């Protein structure tokens, strides 16, 4: 065993520190198992920290990665970065730090895509809406990028655009989320201007990736030319912006909002398909449904036998996903969740439950780890 200084290579966002870290005077700075949640923490530990290096000795089994933990770490870091950019006080290493956030999202999807998708519905209190919505959109954008077989460079530009698309309306976005009032004329003007204003802020912060910036500029354009800010249509809209627009609109519709009724994932996908070639590209809307399924992961459903459960993973067909029943047919919460294959007659899906229906059940809050295991650990 030897004492070794912490280096930047030892740490990355979202990781659980595998050792106790001590300061120069031997005081404990952070305990083993602490999660790295920001680049500032990394800088602090590199500057001050040392640890007992047990390399070569028998190591304890490594804790499995958690997709949920990675996405929460991404939200924490992204919040600070977006605030800095919006205040024209971006750090000089902004691009690197945003790349690190994008990598956390990529890693989360790679660890468990089902958990990453489920967080869109089941992790809505983890960060302010204006930040969390960007993380959610980046998750869906990653799935679409993989389905479209985009290059690594295109996928990176799309993901970074999703993370920063609303940087010019952070304050208004959060206020709209919490308010039951209609938008004021001033707020409406900010919303209409935010694609162009966001591009300007990012340019001022040193971002020069044109594909990324074009994606943000066009993510509110519509297929029929009725969008904003440039009223472009069809092939005039960059392909990456079309993907971002679709991911953005799906995630916005399923989010809890004070000012409008929350849509079920099933209904949100149906609406996007009905809007084919008016607001969104019809082929891409169909692709989104293929990727998420008719019953996206995390959807609450009622089964034929009366049980209520959560869609936990895809089935052999989009109409027959696997479900974890969490409430019994008589309305009592189940102490042990029951795995149900909805191909079975009694376990078929009767209906998708709305947010209002769920509110009447008075069931205990669902911990994602109960359904998806350690890859959904906090």
Where are these regions (language model features)?
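Juxtamembrane/interface motifs at transmembrane-helix termini
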Residues: 51, 176-179, 211, 233-235
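Residue-level signal for pocket-adjacent positions within structured domains
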Residues: 6, 16, 24-25, 31, ...
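Short helix/loop capping segments that flank catalytic or ligand/cofactor-binding pockets
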Residues: 39, 153, 254-255
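Acidic/His-rich, divalent-metal-binding segments that scaffold phosphate/diphosphate chemistry
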Residues: 58-192, 196-199, 203-209
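Terminal helices and disordered tails flanking the catalytic cores of nucleotide-processing hydrolases
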Residues: 1-102, 258, 262-378
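A short alpha-helix capping/helix-coil boundary motif
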Residues: 19-22, 120-121, 177-179, 247, ...
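Alpha-helical scaffolding flanking metal-ion-dependent phosphate/phosphodiester catalytic sites
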Residues: 33, 137, 158-171, 186-200, ...
